[in-house]
Amino acid sequence: YDDVYVIGDATNIMLPPKTGALAHYEALHVVRSIINQVHGYGKTQFDGSAMCAVYGSGSDGFFIYMNYYKSKAYGPSPIFRSAKKTFQGLYWLSLKGVVDPFLEFSKRFFSGGP
């Protein structure tokens, strides 16, 4: 359907994994697409790009990059475990409005550019 946007488990994307990180990047893409439509720019296509840090065993973690064509895991490393802890903190702050994850996109689009 035109003008219908879906994120997360409800999408028709069949590739695993359906992660919270992927839903986050889908949401950012939906915001960008709606703003493009409001300003008369063309639709954009989401390529499935997402990244996330995950906990591993002990003091290690992994960093994962994925898109529709490939996935790559980096690690194990204590640095990636620290990144996961940091990302969690930023996520909860964004829900409280302390950190605005859409600010970059908003500034770009409201300044008149795609």
Indicate where each model-derived feature is located.
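Rossmann-fold NAD(P)-binding glycine/threonine-rich loop
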Residues: 1-2
